Amino acid sequence: MSRQFPHSSAPLRSVKEVQFGLLSPEEVRAISVAKIEYPETMDQATKRPREGGLNDPRLGSIDRNFKCQTCGEDMAECPGHFGHIELAKPVFHIGFIAKIKKVCECVCMHCGKLLLDESNPAMAQAIRIRDPKKRFNAVWNLCKGKMICEADVLQDDGEGNEPKRTSRGGCGHTQPVVRKDGLKLWGTWKQNKNYDETEQPERRLLTPSEILNVFKHINSEDCVRLGFNEDYARPEWMLITVLPVPPPPVRPSIAFNDTARGEDDLTFKLADVIKANINVQRLELDGSPQHVISEFEALLQFHVATYMDNDIAGQPQALQKTGRPIKSIRARLKGKEGRLRGNLMGKRVDFSARTVISGDPNLDLDQVGVPISIARTLTYPEIVTPYNIHRLTEYVRNGPNEHPGAKYVIRDTGDRIDLRYNKRAGDIALQYGWKVERHLMDDDPVLFNRQPSLHKMSMMCHRVKVMPYSTFRLNLSVTSPYNADFDGDEMNLHVPQSPETRAELSEICAVPLQIVSPQSNKPVMGIVQDTLCGVRKMTLRDIFIEYDQVMNMLYWIPDWDGVIPPMNLKDLNNVKQMVVSGSKGSFINISQMSACVGQQIVEGKRIPFGFADRSLPHFTKDDYSPESKGFVENSYLRGLTPQEFFFHAMAGREGLIDTAVKTAETGYIQRRLVKALEDIMVHYDGTTRNSLGDIIQFVYGEDGVDGTQVESQSVDVIPGTDESFERRYRVDLLDPEKCIRDSLLESGKEVRGDVNLQRVLDEEYEQLCNDRRYLREVCFTNGDYTWPLPVNLRRIIQNAQQLFHGGRHKASDLRLEEIVEGVKELCKKLLVLRGDSPLVKESQENATLLFQCLVRSRLATRRVIEEFRLNRMSFEWAMGEIETQFQKSLVHPGEMVGVIAAQSIGEPATQMTLNTFHYAGVSSKNVTLGVPRLKEILNVAKNIKTPALTVYLEKDIAADIEKAKVVQSAIEHTTLKNVTASTEIFYDPDPRSTVLEEDYDTVEAYFAIPDEKVEESIEKQSPWLLRLELDRAKMLDKQLTMAQVAEKISQNFGEDLFVIWSDDTADKLIIRCRVVRDPKSLDEDVDAEEDQILKRIEAHMLESISLRGIQGITRVFMMQHKLSLPDETGEFKQGQEWVLETDGVNLADVMAVPGVDAKRTYSNNFIEILSVLGIEATRSALFKEILNVIAFDGSYVNYRHMALLVDVMTARGHLMAITRHGINRADTGALMRCSFEETVEILLEAGAAAELDDCHGISENVVLGQLAPLGTGAFDVMVDDKILQSSPSNMSVPVGAAEGAGAYADDGGATPYREYDMEDDKIQFEEGAGFSPIHTAPVSDGAGALTAYGGQPGSPSPTSPFAYGATSPAYGGASPGYGVTSPTYSPTSPSYSPTSPSYSPTSPSYSPTSPSYSPTSPSYSPTSPSYSPTSPSYSPTSPSYSPTSPSYSPTSPSYSPTSPSYSPTSPSYSPTSPSYSPTSPSYSPTSPSYSPTSPSYSPTSPLYSPTSPSYSPTSPSYSPTSPSYSPTSPSYSPTSPQYSPTSPAYSPTSPQYSPNSPQYSPRSPLYSPDQNDDKDKKQ
């Protein structure tokens, strides 16, 4: 902090936990410094704040001329002090009024005792609940029905004796029913049961004073049972007796002139409270009648309530004089602009800039062009050290207006010198330890951002490049992650203000490190637009370019071609070129421009008829012709007619509206996702947990791998026939046909017939068969065999073949059992979780299972020898490489995977169209998709728009459409209404005959055969007839017969209805029903009502008679689904099966239908799945649904993100919606919940329940402004005091010597890319070898000048084998790369000024010919000596460079480029020193005496000279993990003779020296010395 605060005796600590509670009246009085009694703020006589008024001077100063009377500080420093108002009568706190009512229902309103106690078993259960809020609700639910406070209870002793009476100390009074009305509570006392019902119950007001009195009597035990807290939140504190008055800084007033002040809303409101309070006091003293007093009490209650909350339902809002509602305290806190979300969770910050962006193809991917005006405004505080004092002095001299300058100097006392007003700025002598706020310079890391920030690639770290003019410039390829274009977009830039932040930005957030996105494990940046189009043109098969033309490509472009154009668009057509190369546009754009715009669609249909059956007035009625319904036949080129234009505008308008609505919807979805998952992090034990420590996943993503490190790979054991599988993997040494060819193996002859070896190979083959079976039956049942897995095996094998290509044509020296053993060992080494407990072992096995199958299938014995032809060296190298890469691809502890998952799901949602119109499928079966469906899933909606089942059938039925139809009709729910065409009621008095001609035959036929029962009932039959006519088509469709329908009707009504039905073959399908009357009630007047009865029967019949099928299934469609199953040869074949899809769901009943495959049947309503199949099935269903939504429009999101989301939603055993009803019902801290929604309610609830927030979450720490425990803050750093004491102090170096090093030493660059000054033309590259971006050789330095990360051992560094003299052509002063005009050696750079005293060209240590200081030396990166981008050991993916590795912490003393012992120019480090001659005897690499802990190694010790014989870089103990390892040490420099890549000692073919050989595992405990001996012997 640069500002100095006045001295305070309070110790400074970070907040560890927050205790919520209610203030008791005693506390309020104790906190208060003034009792406020007057509503005025100013004393009119003295024109000063009035004592005892609302702006009492003791509360804090409001005027910069006066000091605060309490603390004596001025306006800027005084934090303000609380006052208090003594209320004449207690009032309810508006936030707690509902809680007060509930407590009234729990305790006796007479004696304050809880109405139930442990003697009630349900109550005993409720009291045991630990969470106070839940406990209170449980107790309230039991007590609210209890209407009497019992004096003694009957207790049953359980042995059948008389129940005993035990006293519980109640008072025996009846309890009132409490009702809330506005701001009042009313109690209604019901009289005892034995009184008359007519008697009016007593109803009266429960005054706050009365309730306060009752609450004071609640004893501490009951207090805890009710979920309160004796110390922090007693129930009576929910009523306000003393109102705290916030200090003026909370409610500042504006001075218009000396007299008038504009007061804040809260001040107005407090004045109203005081006025009302004075009125009540006055009336009390005057002894006014009660009804008058209660009027004024209600007014006081109203003012206190609206002061806190002015949006009370059913209450008039308190208004200001202008008629604007007053802004209450609650309104200040809640909502997006409120205190929490607006000022605590997110604030406006300093050191930021915003301007328009434009593109610049000449910038690096990770650079950003910053206007000079911004660079002069933004600063970075740099601490003065011996290494930068010259440079900083130069900046201070330049002052604030000249670009490489400075704005402020801050002394160690904290005083700030403003250089704008300091006339003698040039004379300020900087001291070590001061700070200089210097301008933004080239290569400073900055955070660059474009809103909306939908994923983490919307904020990335760029390197500054200061440029003229006023816009930010950025490389074209970086626009896609920002979703930016140059049509006027603006972007924000933030400057980090501490070395830690800079380090974190440049090592974690740098653009090159974000190229591969974890969202869908693919690059998010690529070549776009012009570049893409140009690249395609240059690389067409028929375009040939001369070498010199390529060299000068920037100056002219070849126009050679010799191709006859085809009939379609010429390849030279500019539009077509853009489409084909993919830089802009699509096929449809071309068609619409040149051929025809096509049909316009609104809401998924053609243009609708707007009025009077036409779409526009000049069409005729019912015109369905194309032009009337919106078909545009013209192209944009020909132009649209007016009506076409109008229809086109309609469709376009819909798109715009859709986009606007969608943006708001998806923005809210994204916010909810982030809030639900924000605290989920990978911990150091490999588990994924939230801030409470609940385990969400045992292993992140179920495999523990980082989403950016996986690639789609095919597991080769899954596809293919059994025969081809055997051919590919089985080795039979006893059968010459199936044995490996002799010519491929050195031991080819010996292995023939080796039974023991055959046993090993059989075991391997058996394992492969098991893999194949398991993967086919469990994992990939549909025969799909690609899956995102870590470590690209194909690439590793290819690199192995190329690096060790000598062995490709010779027989391999591998032994077969070595391969099997090697693969087994490798599988054991793939550790995701470490530990021995059974649980850990199981998780470990599950996590690596798929990858093990992949490794076993790729590195099977037969394939290694026959297909890949690896020899021992290349095989061992590959094994080591796989292990290293696998360890590298594991997820880092501290990674905030929750937020990544939320962004990965929210971002595609933004791209989704809102209403995805129903896809044209079978008879309009529609499914909700897109954003509306995503909303349903995340809200866990009870009633979804389109519930549907997918009913799979048993094998034999699924193949046969006829059998499937039987099941279909059995499932589809059919009511009588579905098949009825019409119903009629007739008066047809004779039951044996009929007045209807067409029914005559039916009736005759029925009565032709006499039946006793029928004869009996004829007498009782009603003359009214209900006649149903059924629809024959529907009956046939549903396969129903008349008899079945009639039987269902009879079943329903039994003997009371007489039913006659026509034959199935009759002309019309008729059912005749008559009511059978009870002979007892054969009165005449019944006849009159009978037709009414019949009408009711008719309605009931149609609605409720279910003919067949399952309730809830309205329709069933038959669909053919593709199915791939292995046939008898073992190959997956595509087949078809019939599947039923339904509208409506009823999973439990459908599963029970015979013929349905219950195992596969699926419902898209996962709430139903939860009730039928349980939570684990729900998790899969939920995953499937989210996947469907995302995959529908062709997006792909990696499995792990969706898995994490569904795991969070189901982790507690019930479905947690991603809404306030789900997220905010979790037991996370109150601060975290209130930062989402319902801010004030949650804080009030937290106060009443006296919650404790332990600040483990993200939001809590953001609110408190602390470092949250995530990412680099997830661990603590242990400081080694011993090393600290022995470390060199900054001041111990002569300034001159240090200055050379300090040239640019203070800060590393941000990215591993850079331009190279020189290249050796003698280098030959093999095709493709080692140029993969991930391939590393950790020791060879300077390798791979053409790739980002490192290359192969045949290192193209500009070196010659032994000649290291100063005359070496690569370093001579005459070397073209080293002119004084060379750009890296700019004479204007301040520290290079030839007049600088430390730069004596004659100084032996600073000879420009010193090889280590040539600007072309890879270790001399212009930004810092320690930052050689070409060094593979600096590769961001290099194992030894793990940002978590303690020895490589950029702040560790041994790494600090500012540490004196690392200055490459320090005299003792001169590589030209004679003892560095490689032939010098003292330079023995095997010298045993070199131990980094030996006293002679203390960097400050006088004995420590690199010339000391014991200092050998190749000495075994000089391991890269040793604390002394620094890439800048000259012994690691590519110019060191020991590292000459061409030196025979560095033979890439020497197996022991392979940098990635298994012995060189970066985690291997020692870099074993005997390797070096072997090497010497070999030479």
Swiss-Prot record:
UniProt lists compositionally biased (Low complexity) regions at: 1382-1565
Record: residues binding Mg(2+) 1: 485, 487, 489
List the residue ranges of the region (Bridging helix).
Answer: 642-654
Primary enzyme class: transferase
Q: Which domain of life is it from?
A: Eukaryota
S-S bonds? none
Q: Name one GO cellular component term.
A: mitochondrion
Q: From the UniProt record, which GO molecular function terms apply? A: DNA binding; DNA-directed RNA polymerase activity; metal ion binding
* Residue ranges of sequence repeats: 1385-1391, 1392-1398, 1399-1405, 1406-1412, 1413-1419, 1420-1426, 1427-1433, 1434-1440, 1441-1447, 1448-1454, 1455-1461, 1462-1468, 1469-1475, 1476-1482, 1483-1489, 1490-1496, 1497-1503, 1504-1510, 1511-1517, 1518-1524, 1525-1531, 1532-1538, 1539-1545, 1546-1552, 1553-1559, 1560-1566
CDD domains per the UniProt record, alphabetical: RNAP_II_Rpb1_C, RNAP_II_RPB1_N
The known PTMs are summarized as: The tandem 7 residues repeats in the C-terminal domain (CTD) can be highly phosphorylated. The phosphorylation activates Pol II. Phosphorylation occurs mainly at residues 'Ser-2' and 'Ser-5' of the heptapeptide repeat. The phosphorylation state is believed to result from the balanced action of site-specific CTD kinases and phosphatase, and a 'CTD code' that specifies the position of Pol II within the transcription cycle has been proposed. Following transcription stress, the elongating form of RNA polymerase II (RNA pol IIo) is polyubiquitinated via 'Lys-63'-linkages on Lys-1080 at DNA damage sites without leading to degradation: ubiquitination promotes RNA pol IIo backtracking to allow access by the transcription-coupled nucleotide excision repair (TC-NER) machinery.
Q: Which Pfam families match?
A: RNA_pol_Rpb1_1, RNA_pol_Rpb1_2, RNA_pol_Rpb1_3, RNA_pol_Rpb1_4, RNA_pol_Rpb1_5, RNA_pol_Rpb1_6, RNA_pol_Rpb1_7, RNA_pol_Rpb1_R
Reported effect, residue 198 to S: In strain: MmRL 1635
Q: Where does Zn(2+) 2 bind?
A: 108, 111, 149, 171
Q: Where does Mg(2+) 2 bind?
A: 485, 487
Q: Which reaction does it catalyse?
A: RNA(n) + a ribonucleoside 5'-triphosphate = RNA(n+1) + diphosphate
Cross-link type Glycyl lysine isopeptide (Lys-Gly) (interchain with G-Cter in ubiquitin), placed at: 1080
Its family remark reads:
Belongs to the RNA polymerase beta' chain family.
Relay the record's extra comment: The binding of ribonucleoside triphosphate to the RNA polymerase II transcribing complex probably involves a two-step mechanism. The initial binding seems to occur at the entry (E) site and involves a magnesium ion temporarily coordinated by three conserved aspartate residues of the two largest RNA Pol II subunits. The ribonucleoside triphosphate is transferred by a rotation to the nucleotide addition (A) site for pairing with the template DNA. The catalytic A site involves three conserved aspartate residues of the RNA Pol II largest subunit which permanently coordinate a second magnesium ion.
What's the record's remark on domains?
A: The C-terminal domain (CTD) serves as a platform for assembly of factors that regulate transcription initiation, elongation, termination and mRNA processing.
What is this protein called in UniProt? DNA-directed RNA polymerase II subunit RPB1
Q: What organism is this sequence from?
A: Meyerozyma guilliermondii (strain ATCC 6260 / CBS 566 / DSM 6381 / JCM 1539 / NBRC 10279 / NRRL Y-324)
